[in-house]
Structure formats: C-alpha cells, structure tokens
Amino acid sequence: MAVESAIRDLVQKMTAERGILLGQIEKLSEKEAEYVPQDAQGEAQWTAKEQCAHVAEMEAGYRAWVERALEEDNPDLTDVRGGPVAVPLEQANKHPLSRLVAELRRQRNETLKVIERLRPIDYDRRATSPMFGTLTILQWLRSYYRHDRMHQAQIAGRKSEYKPHFIKGEPDQRRTKPL
C-alpha cells in the first residue's frame, strides 16, 4: 500500500515537472514552436507543438489505463484508449500554442482529480500493457512526470536522461518524419 509520503511526492513531482514543461513551452514563439529539428530521430523530430499534443494524448491514455485498473484486476490494456484531446498530434501545427498549453493544463487537472479519488491501497492495483508490461497504478502515475521530463529535454534539443522501458516496440514511431 502506498504511504502518504509517496503520494505527496508523486503529486509534487507531477505538478513541478508539468510546470517546468509549460514554462519552457510558453517562452516559445509560434515560429519556434513549429521548428522541426533536422538532426533528431523519433519523437525528438517533432515540433514543440507536436510534442505538446503527444504529451496530452499520452496523459489521456495513461489516465484511461489507471481508470481501467481501478475497475478490473490486472486488466489487459491492449485496446484501452484515452478520450479525445483538444488537438491531436497530426493537427498540432495548425493550432496556436496557447491552445496546446491550455490542453496540457486541462489534462493534468483531470489526472489530479483521479489521484484525489484514490485510496492508498488503490496505488497497488496493477494493469498490463503489451508495450510496458505489468505496472502498478503508482508506477503508471510516476510515468507521467518522467514523460514530461523526457519531452522537456526533446523540446530543448537535449538527449533525455529518461528512457522508457518498452517491452515491445515504441509508441508513435509511425508518426515520425522521414529524414
């Protein structure tokens, strides 16, 4: 069972890392936010706007996984998808940065509402994803702020210190740009 200090630490990190990401993004001009890094690979090739849309999509998806784990014992998450986001990744560059930032704020607020409902014992519930394997709700939720850190680095043009542990494949590689 998750102890209160671990839960407080989780919420603090989720709030802090999202704040850092939003601060970084809000400093960009529209032109800077649409810049395509030419020497990057995978998700690092995306514009800052595409990064924002992706983070929002993943937040909605991870939250759907957490919700399913609350409903069912160790569910298979293969077909579980998050709800729609304001701006899908494929349309990100057609929208103002302010709309993407607002969606990132909205998505995090929705996640924090889910966390408020959780009992300490709920954090031990598990769910299994073909991409990541079996994780507890606490592990799924920790992945949010780690994901934020990864995209902070990518937007800044740095190599991320955080590398997700994929069991099978990598998400969103189908949407990378050809070099």
Which stretches of residues belong to each language-model region?
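Cytochrome P450 catalytic-domain "roof"
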Residues: 27, 32-34
